[in-house]
From Swiss-Prot:
Binding site for Fe cation 2: D73, N112, H207, H242
Known role: May play a role in the process of bone resorption. The osteoclastic trap acts on nucleotide tri- and diphosphates with higher affinity, compared with other substrates.
Name this polypeptide is given: Tartrate-resistant acid phosphatase type 5
Taxonomic placement: Eukaryota, Metazoa, Chordata, Craniata, Vertebrata
Principal localisation: other
GO-annotated biological processes: bone morphogenesis; bone resorption; cellular response to zinc ion starvation; defense response to Gram-positive bacterium; multicellular organismal response to stress; negative regulation of cell adhesion; negative regulation of inflammatory response; negative regulation of interleukin-1 beta production
Tissues in which the protein is found: Characteristic constituent of osteoclasts and some mononuclear preosteoclasts. Preferentially expressed in skeletal tissues.
Pfam families hit by this protein: Metallophos
EC number per UniProt: 3.1.3.2
Carbohydrate attachment residues: N118, N149
Length: 327
């Protein structure tokens, strides 16, 4: 039987007892899910989104989580109109409504479909929902691993502002940013932040992938402009969505590439397999029969573990990345 399922089963049985005697967690834990944004017509969600929400809630209840990271495409297909758009309720609040999720904060970034609507409205919704945290198009988060001096920095990016939007049906690649000055400002901000980052783990997150074997493939703009920064400043991992599957890649510098775009759709395409350097791909899952999935990340004193979880509850793949060496 799958190890993840056995662990979850045992913890379910022991949960009433453990609730009274479990020591405080000594790891930072979060779920990363992308491309979960339902549909623009009733019931405004899909079976896959509902299945993911249910399994995320079960995972959070049993394993614990400090937050949920949204990797963009939060509302299909054209984002939201304003901060009072009913899609916030119908695609987010009413779907991720389990008791286990009610007090878990979400940290949000925008995807290409969000940019077809009003991203400022998604930012403004942060003042309406106690769970929804989207302070600006790009921003920095800092966490401390409980019961330790281990620190984690996360840089949430707007890759559409960096590279431009893309039409999923016409062009697979963003051609150029709408405002080159805004793109340069964001990249300059990130470079300065990474240069100054002293944390034990440094993560960067955006919607577009740097590397992907799937339908959209590597994002040339990010391979050119973002990838060199990850290597130069010893970034632990880059997290993304956009392609509707689950992938893990790792480059020769040890940077992990966590693609988690299976929150609402599944696409089996591997059309760009030859566009990714040999040896990078460690895991890919895009079965059309699957209900999708997400990643569960746990950061401790020595390593960061990443588990790819199918919405059925099955563990698909697990890997780990080491803590950055201290100066």
């Amino acid at each position: 039987m799958d190890t993840w399922m056995v662990l979850l089963g045992l913890q379910i049985l022991l949960l009433p007892l453990l609730a009274h005697c479990t020591a405080p967690a000594s790891t930072l834990r979060f779920v990363a899910v992308g491309d979960w944004g339902g549909v623009p017509n009733a019931p405004f969600h899909t079976a896959r989104e509902m299945a993911n929400a249910k399994e995320i809630a079960r995972t959070v209840q049993i394993m614990g989580a400090d937050f949920i990271m949204s990797l963009g495409d939060n509302f299909y297909f054209t984002g939201v109109h304003d901060a009072n758009d009913k899609r916030f309720q119908e695609t987010f609040e009413d779907v991720f409504s389990d008791r286990a999720l009610r007090n878990i904060p979400w940290y949000v970034l925008a995807g290409n479909h969000d940019h077809l609507g009003n991203v400022s409205a998604q930012i403004a919704y942060s003042k309406i929902s106690k769970r929804w945290n989207f302070p600006s198009p790009y921003y920095r988060l800092r966490f401390k691993v409980p019961r330790s001096n281990i620190t984690v920095a996360i840089f949430m990016l707007d890759t559409v502002m960096l590279c431009g939007n893309s039409d999923d049906f016409v062009s697979q690649q963003p051609e150029m940013p709408r405002d080159l000055g805004v793109a340069r400002t964001q990249l300059s901000w990130l470079k300065k932040q990474l240069a100054a980052a002293k944390e034990d783990y440094v993560l960067v997150a955006g919607h577009y992938p740097i590397w992907s074997i799937a339908e959209h493939g590597p994002t040339r703009c990010l391979v050119k402009n973002l990838r060199p920064l990850l290597a130069a400043y010893g970034v632990t991992a880059y997290l993304c969505g956009h392609d509707h599957n689950l992938q893990y890649l790792q480059d020769e510098n040890g940077v992990g590439y966590v693609l988690s775009g299976a929150g609402n759709f599944m696409d089996p395409s591997v059309r760009h397999q030859r566009k990714v350097p040999n040896g990078y791909l460690r895991f890919h899952y895009g079965s059309e029969d699957s209900l999708g999935g997400f990643t569960y990340v746990e950061i401790g004193s020595k390593e960061m573990s990443i588990t790819y979880v199918e919405a059925s509850g099955k563990s698909l793949f697990k890997t780990s990345l080491p803590r950055r060496p201290r100066p």
